[in-house]
């Protein structure tokens, strides 16, 4: 019985190494054309996105807004790129007085809808996001529709992260998850993975609320005698901020160093553990980003440094080979398996 555990963290600086030395390392060069969270996860699973998803720097078009308002019975406010926290400070009061939905986007391909839980019931907010997901097709097909319920009083609004819900577009091609499930292997997920892949190819899952909750659920899954993949998202949504990447990357590495022993303690002889980051940064503007990959396990070649590897899809190719699945989906098999 073989198991592969793939853990995705927040941003880590390319040259950082955990205190517990990995058995093997690699630097993965991202191939997908738009560096969004969703395409990073898809590429790790073998699906490279060469066509950028649409973004809306000027907000969503009026024709769509009219259809959405008619379908939901609510007007919307904002409708432009905005910081998630700042939009509550600037428009939370307007929303609670009027009942209008807060619609905002970002630099990524995303439609975010926020509402106070006492103004719009959370289940209704979910329904409105499902409506948006159906209306956003063709040139409007964003990668993710996100429900962002919040609570609190004016000046002290905060998102209810455990009630955050993501409605992703379905992957445009086959992924490692599909290949494993079709081969009757287990595919477990923790965190936002279930949403990022629109539930496709996953046999069991747990959503999580932040790093620590995700870690505990990952460790619980590792207690099971399963045969296949555990794909765990431990990210807290903290990318390597351009303003202070050193501070953010250091904090994320400290979290890994503190908790890596817990993961390694649960590794069995036939397990392999791959740890990488959801985001990173490039010193050159426009250059494809590199994601550090740390590999552990008795079946990993000790001391192997794979250097720069083109594509995050080398992770899926290597895991598929290790688990005995013939399908590869592209990407190089890393020279780390004994």
Could you tell me what each predicted segment is?
Residues 1-338:
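Feature captures the catalytic ectodomains and active-site-proximal regions of enzymes
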